[in-house]
């Protein structure tokens, strides 16, 4: 899951070296904390949150493959 999210996010941002992921996995849940450079925050969130919504949808559906619930937190 980490590699999947990292690959997608790095394709969106200018400062790839500042993409940070922290993945906490329990028996039924995967929590992914995402941090990017301040300049790239708008690209990750998108207009009216559409990009963030799309990223969360991808993560949610990818986690369903393992019958888990996924939460993507975009932190500043």
Residue ranges and their predicted role:
Residues 1-43, 54-76:
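RNA-contacting regions in translation and RNA-metabolism proteins
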Residues 45-49:
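Glycine-centered tight-turn and secondary-structure capping sites
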């Amino acid at each position: 899951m980490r590699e999947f999210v990292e690959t997608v996010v790095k394709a969106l941002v200018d400062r790839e070296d500042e993409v940070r992921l922290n993945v906490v996995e329990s028996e039924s849940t995967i929590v992914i904390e995402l941090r990017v450079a301040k300049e790239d925050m708008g690209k990750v969130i998108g207009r009216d949150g559409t990009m963030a919504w799309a990223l969360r949808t991808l993560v949610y559906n990818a986690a369903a493959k393992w019958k888990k619930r996924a939460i993507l937190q975009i932190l500043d």
